[in-house]
């Protein structure tokens, strides 16, 4: 009971008076406070919605017995007992506060020490732990564990690294995201399509000599291996080259994009033309965009106000061309083809159909599928 007492005391200090366990999770249930500002990875990769569902299912199964479960695991740690795979899975899905995660860290170290030379099917704990850290804004803990040499092999999948890079990217911690990328390379974890997207996005945001070297190295590696540069990664790389005033390089990168029929690609192309083509060519491009048939079935090109301003600035010294530009600008405006979005916002935009909110899990579902009773009377009350 001494073990239980110390654990309970610790949790009470952290949880401000011992709120109901399920109410605590319900309050953090739309647990992605990042949802409105999350940019790059979709829920198909992050799987936060699926993770939240599993958490609620686990909490429902042992409702009222979380302390006892944590006591049982603590007792195993004290007795040097073997931590089973399903026990760690359950533990991670029960965590709802930072002290819970701190306790889970101890269990992870023990579990990995016991099982680092044993494979248990295809299950990987790394992504589960990273989703937990993403949910609770614990990027410091996630980064520390990911870089810890004693846990080599625990985070052996690219998804764990991608989730952490995405978390750091949304928080503007670009230098630390580079640390994750370097650590991923040091641990010889194979880069995925999403890794490249995140890597070029971070380089674009940093816009410094070091990120320029990283970007160049990655582009050279992709060229050597013959891999296909993901479209979103290519857009970031081209935009980064424009930031660096390497206009021909931006044009070369852009030429590798297979499908350019998007608002982002059209704006990138316009900006590249502004810096590499004649102003006559730029005007022809814009005039062609206003010359559509008017059919609702034909998608009209849409341009960023910011990018158009760059084009207009270039034409200021040429009165005749600038007059033509103003005429085209007015036609685009009248047709609703000018967007307030900046190029940066277009780059960091995730399509709505690929973005799922986690909040609806608790907000929309009011009735239990099993009992047809209100969830207010079961899961969410003290």
Swiss-Prot record:
Q: What is its main location?
A: mitochondrion
- NCBIfam families reported for this sequence: PPR (TIGR00756)
- Subcellular locations according to the entry: Mitochondrion
Which family does the similarity line name? Belongs to the PTCD2 family.
Identify the stretches annotated as PPR repeats: 159-193
Q: Name one GO molecular function term.
A: RNA binding
Please provide the Gene Ontology terms (biological process) for this protein.
Answer: mitochondrion organization; mRNA processing; regulation of mRNA processing
Q: Which InterPro entries match?
A: mS27/PTCD2 (IPR034913), Pentatricopeptide_rpt (IPR002885), PTCD2 (IPR034629), TPR-like_helical_dom_sf (IPR011990)
Q: What keywords appear on the UniProt entry?
A: Mitochondrion, mRNA processing
Q: What is this protein called?
A: Pentatricopeptide repeat-containing protein 2, mitochondrial
Native species: Xenopus laevis
- Gene that encodes the chain: ptcd2
One Pfam match, given by its short name, reads: MRP-S27
Query: Do you know which PANTHER family this protein is assigned to?
Result: PENTATRICOPEPTIDE REPEAT-CONTAINING PROTEIN 2, MITOCHONDRIAL
Function text: May be involved in mitochondrial RNA maturation and mitochondrial respiratory chain function.
- Has keyword Phosphoprotein? no
| Gene Ontology cellular-component terms listed | mitochondrion
Keyword hit for Mitochondrion: yes
């Amino acid at each position: 009971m001494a073990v239980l007492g110390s654990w309970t005391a610790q949790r009470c200090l952290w949880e401000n008076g011992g709120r109901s366990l399920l109410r605590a999770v319900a309050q953090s249930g739309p647990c992605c406070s990042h949802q409105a500002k999350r940019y790059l990875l979709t829920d198909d990769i992050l799987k936060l919605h699926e993770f939240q569902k599993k958490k609620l299912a686990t909490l429902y199964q042992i409702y009222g017995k979380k302390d006892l479960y944590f006591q049982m695991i603590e007792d195993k740690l004290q007795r040097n007992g073997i931590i089973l795979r399903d026990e760690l899975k359950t533990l991670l899905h029960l965590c709802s506060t930072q002290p819970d995660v701190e306790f889970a860290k101890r269990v992870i170290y023990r579990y990995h020490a016991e099982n680092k030379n044993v494979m248990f099917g295809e299950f990987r704990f790394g992504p589960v732990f990273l989703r937990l850290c993403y949910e609770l804004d614990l990027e410091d803990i996630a980064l520390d564990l990911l870089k810890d040499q004693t846990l080599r092999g625990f985070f052996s999948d690219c998804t764990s690294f991608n989730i952490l890079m995405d978390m750091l990217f949304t928080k503007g911690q670009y230098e630390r995201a580079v640390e994750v990328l370097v650590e991923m390379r040091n641990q010889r974890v194979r880069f995925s399509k999403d890794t490249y997207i995140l890597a070029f996005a971070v380089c674009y945001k940093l816009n410094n000599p070091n990120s320029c070297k990283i970007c160049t190295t990655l582009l050279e590696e992709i060229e050597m291996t013959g891999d296909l540069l993901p479209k979103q990664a290519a857009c970031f790389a081209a935009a980064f080259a424009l930031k660096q005033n390497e206009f021909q390089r931006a044009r070369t990168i852009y030429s590798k994009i297979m499908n350019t029929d998007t608002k982002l690609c059209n704006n990138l192309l316009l900006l590249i033309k502004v810096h590499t083509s004649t102003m006559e060519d730029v005007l022809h491009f814009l005039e062609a965009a206003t010359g559509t048939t008017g059919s609702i079935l034909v998608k009209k090109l849409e341009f960023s106000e910011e990018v158009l301003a760059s084009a207009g600035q270039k034409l200021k010294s040429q009165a005749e061309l600038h007059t033509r530009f103003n005429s085209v600008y007015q036609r685009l405006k009248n047709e609703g083809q000018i967007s307030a979005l900046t190029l940066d916002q277009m780059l960091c935009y995730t399509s709505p159909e690929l973005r799922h909110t986690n909040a609806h899990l608790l907000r929309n579902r009011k009735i239990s599928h099993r009992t047809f009773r209100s969830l207010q009377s079961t899961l969410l009350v003290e």
